[in-house]
Protein backbone atom coordinates (compact mmCIF):
# COMPACT_ATOMS: atom_id res chain seq x y z
CA UNK A 1 0.00 0.00 0.00
CA UNK A 2 1.13 3.58 -0.59
CA UNK A 3 1.39 6.25 2.10
CA UNK A 4 -2.13 7.56 1.47
CA UNK A 5 -3.51 4.07 2.00
CA UNK A 6 -1.40 3.68 5.14
CA UNK A 7 -2.79 6.95 6.51
CA UNK A 8 -6.43 6.23 5.66
CA UNK A 9 -6.40 2.64 6.89
CA UNK A 10 -4.61 3.71 10.07
CA UNK A 11 -7.51 6.06 10.81
CA UNK A 12 -10.08 3.33 10.22
CA UNK A 13 -8.35 0.75 12.42
CA UNK A 14 -7.48 3.27 15.12
CA UNK A 15 -11.05 4.56 15.35
CA UNK A 16 -12.39 1.01 15.46
CA UNK A 17 -10.02 -0.22 18.14
CA UNK A 18 -10.48 2.93 20.26
CA UNK A 19 -14.25 3.15 19.60
CA UNK A 20 -13.76 6.80 18.53
CA UNK A 21 -12.94 7.64 22.16
CA UNK A 22 -9.40 8.89 21.50
CA UNK A 23 -8.45 12.07 19.65
CA UNK A 24 -7.26 11.58 16.10
CA UNK A 25 -3.57 11.58 15.25
CA UNK A 26 -1.95 13.96 12.80
CA UNK A 27 0.20 12.83 9.88
CA UNK A 28 3.46 13.36 11.75
CA UNK A 29 2.30 11.21 14.66
CA UNK A 30 1.08 8.50 12.31
CA UNK A 31 4.39 8.58 10.44
CA UNK A 32 6.37 8.18 13.67
CA UNK A 33 4.24 5.20 14.71
CA UNK A 34 4.37 3.55 11.28
CA UNK A 35 8.16 3.92 11.16
CA UNK A 36 8.56 2.55 14.68
CA UNK A 37 6.25 -0.37 13.85
CA UNK A 38 8.23 -1.14 10.71
CA UNK A 39 11.55 -1.25 12.59
CA UNK A 40 10.12 -3.40 15.38
CA UNK A 41 8.76 -5.90 12.87
CA UNK A 42 12.11 -6.12 11.07
CA UNK A 43 13.88 -6.80 14.38
CA UNK A 44 11.32 -9.37 15.47
CA UNK A 45 11.46 -11.17 12.14
CA UNK A 46 15.24 -11.26 12.41
CA UNK A 47 15.45 -12.53 16.00
CA UNK A 48 13.86 -15.96 16.69
CA UNK A 49 13.01 -14.93 20.25
CA UNK A 50 11.04 -11.96 18.97
CA UNK A 51 8.22 -13.87 17.30
CA UNK A 52 5.85 -16.62 18.30
CA UNK A 53 7.21 -19.09 15.75
CA UNK A 54 10.75 -18.96 17.14
CA UNK A 55 12.13 -18.60 13.62
CA UNK A 56 14.65 -16.06 12.43
CA UNK A 57 15.85 -14.95 9.01
CA UNK A 58 17.76 -18.18 8.33
CA UNK A 59 14.83 -20.40 9.33
CA UNK A 60 12.25 -19.10 6.89
CA UNK A 61 12.51 -18.60 3.11
CA UNK A 62 9.50 -16.27 3.41
CA UNK A 63 11.40 -13.96 5.74
CA UNK A 64 14.35 -13.90 3.36
CA UNK A 65 11.99 -12.82 0.56
CA UNK A 66 10.33 -10.24 2.82
CA UNK A 67 13.72 -8.67 3.57
CA UNK A 68 15.35 -9.11 0.16
CA UNK A 69 15.01 -5.38 -0.58
CA UNK A 70 17.00 -4.54 2.54
CA UNK A 71 19.88 -7.03 2.36
CA UNK A 72 23.20 -5.49 1.34
CA UNK A 73 26.88 -6.35 1.31
CA UNK A 74 29.27 -3.59 2.31
CA UNK A 75 32.81 -3.01 3.50
CA UNK A 76 33.96 -1.80 6.85
CA UNK A 77 36.38 1.12 6.71
CA UNK A 78 39.53 1.19 8.80
CA UNK A 79 39.17 4.04 11.27
CA UNK A 80 42.50 5.82 11.21
CA UNK A 81 41.22 8.58 13.51
CA UNK A 82 40.29 6.16 16.31
CA UNK A 83 42.29 6.30 19.56
CA UNK A 84 45.68 4.66 19.16
CA UNK A 85 45.11 2.74 22.39
CA UNK A 86 42.75 -0.23 22.17
CA UNK A 87 42.00 -2.63 25.00
CA UNK A 88 43.59 -5.44 22.99
CA UNK A 89 46.83 -4.60 21.21
CA UNK A 90 45.86 -6.89 18.31
CA UNK A 91 42.62 -5.00 17.65
CA UNK A 92 41.94 -2.78 14.66
CA UNK A 93 38.98 -0.39 14.66
CA UNK A 94 36.64 -0.42 11.67
CA UNK A 95 33.58 1.73 10.95
CA UNK A 96 30.49 -0.14 9.79
CA UNK A 97 28.28 1.11 6.92
CA UNK A 98 26.21 4.12 7.98
CA UNK A 99 22.90 2.53 6.93
CA UNK A 100 23.49 -0.71 8.87
CA UNK A 101 20.51 -1.87 10.91
CA UNK A 102 21.17 -5.56 11.67
CA UNK A 103 24.24 -7.69 10.89
CA UNK A 104 23.65 -11.03 9.14
CA UNK A 105 27.22 -12.27 8.76
CA UNK A 106 30.71 -10.89 8.27
CA UNK A 107 34.23 -11.96 7.34
CA UNK A 108 37.76 -10.59 7.11
CA UNK A 109 40.48 -11.29 4.59
CA UNK A 110 43.94 -11.61 6.13
CA UNK A 111 47.41 -12.52 4.96
CA UNK A 112 46.59 -16.04 6.24
CA UNK A 113 43.29 -16.36 4.37
CA UNK A 114 39.63 -15.53 4.96
CA UNK A 115 38.30 -15.64 8.53
CA UNK A 116 34.67 -15.77 9.62
CA UNK A 117 33.78 -13.16 12.24
CA UNK A 118 32.48 -14.36 15.61
CA UNK A 119 30.83 -11.54 17.61
CA UNK A 120 31.82 -11.66 21.28
CA UNK A 121 30.65 -9.71 24.31
CA UNK A 122 32.89 -7.99 26.84
CA UNK A 123 32.37 -10.88 29.27
CA UNK A 124 33.20 -13.35 26.49
CA UNK A 125 36.45 -11.47 25.93
CA UNK A 126 37.36 -11.71 29.62
CA UNK A 127 36.60 -15.44 29.62
CA UNK A 128 38.64 -16.04 26.45
CA UNK A 129 41.59 -14.07 27.79
CA UNK A 130 41.55 -16.23 30.93
CA UNK A 131 42.41 -19.31 28.90
CA UNK A 132 45.95 -20.50 28.17
CA UNK A 133 45.35 -20.06 24.42
CA UNK A 134 44.23 -16.49 23.87
CA UNK A 135 43.85 -16.45 20.09
CA UNK A 136 40.83 -16.98 17.82
CA UNK A 137 40.65 -20.52 16.51
CA UNK A 138 41.61 -21.29 12.92
CA UNK A 139 39.40 -19.60 10.29
CA UNK A 140 37.83 -17.30 12.89
CA UNK A 141 38.27 -13.71 14.06
CA UNK A 142 36.58 -11.86 16.91
CA UNK A 143 34.49 -8.72 16.80
CA UNK A 144 33.65 -6.40 19.72
CA UNK A 145 31.51 -3.24 19.57
CA UNK A 146 33.58 -0.21 20.53
CA UNK A 147 33.13 3.48 21.27
CA UNK A 148 32.72 5.93 18.40
CA UNK A 149 31.30 9.45 18.22
CA UNK A 150 29.91 9.60 14.71
CA UNK A 151 29.93 5.99 13.49
CA UNK A 152 29.05 2.45 14.45
CA UNK A 153 32.50 1.02 15.08
CA UNK A 154 33.92 -2.38 15.96
CA UNK A 155 37.24 -3.80 17.10
CA UNK A 156 38.39 -6.76 15.02
CA UNK A 157 40.86 -9.21 16.52
CA UNK A 158 42.80 -11.79 14.53
CA UNK A 159 45.79 -13.90 15.51
CA UNK A 160 48.91 -12.01 16.51
CA UNK A 161 50.81 -12.98 13.35
CA UNK A 162 48.00 -11.99 10.97
CA UNK A 163 47.09 -8.71 9.26
CA UNK A 164 43.60 -7.70 8.13
CA UNK A 165 43.37 -6.61 4.49
CA UNK A 166 39.60 -6.40 4.01
CA UNK A 167 36.41 -6.52 6.11
CA UNK A 168 33.05 -7.35 4.53
CA UNK A 169 29.60 -7.31 6.10
CA UNK A 170 26.30 -8.73 4.89
CA UNK A 171 23.57 -6.81 6.65
CA UNK A 172 20.03 -5.54 6.73
CA UNK A 173 20.07 -1.81 6.11
CA UNK A 174 17.79 0.52 8.01
CA UNK A 175 14.54 0.79 6.05
CA UNK A 176 13.47 4.24 4.94
CA UNK A 177 10.89 5.78 7.28
CA UNK A 178 7.21 5.67 6.35
CA UNK A 179 6.19 9.33 6.06
CA UNK A 180 2.68 10.13 4.91
CA UNK A 181 3.09 13.87 4.22
CA UNK A 182 5.70 16.55 3.66
CA UNK A 183 6.69 17.23 7.26
CA UNK A 184 8.62 20.46 6.65
CA UNK A 185 5.67 22.18 4.99
CA UNK A 186 3.12 20.90 7.52
CA UNK A 187 4.99 20.90 10.83
CA UNK A 188 8.14 22.95 10.41
CA UNK A 189 11.64 21.71 11.12
CA UNK A 190 10.89 18.08 12.01
CA UNK A 191 12.28 14.89 10.50
CA UNK A 192 12.03 11.14 11.01
CA UNK A 193 15.39 9.40 10.72
CA UNK A 194 16.66 12.51 8.97
CA UNK A 195 13.90 12.55 6.33
CA UNK A 196 11.16 15.18 6.06
CA UNK A 197 9.58 14.43 2.67
CA UNK A 198 6.96 11.82 1.75
CA UNK A 199 8.55 8.38 2.00
CA UNK A 200 6.93 5.12 0.89
CA UNK A 201 7.35 1.79 2.67
CA UNK A 202 10.20 -0.18 1.08
CA UNK A 203 9.28 -3.56 2.51
CA UNK A 204 7.47 -6.33 0.68
CA UNK A 205 3.73 -5.50 0.41
CA UNK A 206 3.04 -8.87 2.04
CA UNK A 207 3.86 -7.39 5.45
CA UNK A 208 2.34 -3.92 5.02
CA UNK A 209 -0.80 -4.96 6.88
CA UNK A 210 1.32 -6.21 9.79
CA UNK A 211 3.13 -2.87 9.96
CA UNK A 212 -0.20 -1.06 9.97
CA UNK A 213 -1.64 -3.27 12.71
CA UNK A 214 1.48 -2.86 14.85
CA UNK A 215 1.38 0.93 14.45
CA UNK A 216 -2.24 1.05 15.61
CA UNK A 217 -1.40 -1.15 18.61
CA UNK A 218 1.48 1.18 19.48
CA UNK A 219 -0.87 4.15 19.27
CA UNK A 220 -3.38 2.44 21.54
CA UNK A 221 -0.71 1.54 24.11
CA UNK A 222 0.67 5.09 24.05
CA UNK A 223 -2.78 6.66 24.53
CA UNK A 224 -3.78 4.36 27.36
CA UNK A 225 -0.37 4.53 29.03
CA UNK A 226 -0.52 0.75 29.30
CA UNK A 227 3.00 -0.42 30.18
CA UNK A 228 2.04 -4.10 30.05
CA UNK A 229 0.58 -3.69 26.59
CA UNK A 230 3.74 -1.94 25.44
CA UNK A 231 5.85 -4.83 26.73
CA UNK A 232 3.62 -7.43 25.09
CA UNK A 233 3.99 -5.65 21.76
CA UNK A 234 7.57 -6.91 21.74
CA UNK A 235 6.29 -10.33 20.72
CA UNK A 236 3.24 -10.41 18.53
CA UNK A 237 2.22 -12.24 15.39
CA UNK A 238 5.35 -12.10 13.23
UniProtKB/Swiss-Prot annotation:
Complex formation: Homododecamer.
Protein's name in the database: Ring protein 4/5
Keywords for this protein: Virion
Presence of the UniProt keyword Transmembrane helix in the record: no
The organism's taxonomic lineage, starting at the top: Viruses, Duplodnaviria, Heunggongvirae, Uroviricota, Caudoviricetes
Note, other: The barrel is composed of five stacked dodecameric ring structures. Rings 4 and 5 are both composed of gp34. Podoviridae-like phages usually possess only one such ring. The tail is thus rather long.
Subcellular localization, as worded in the UniProt entry: Virion
First-listed, main subcellular location of the protein, grouped into a coarse class: virion
Keyword Calcium listed: no
Main function: Forms the tail multi-ring barrel with ring protein 1, ring protein 2 and ring protein 3.
A cellular-component GO term for this protein: virion component
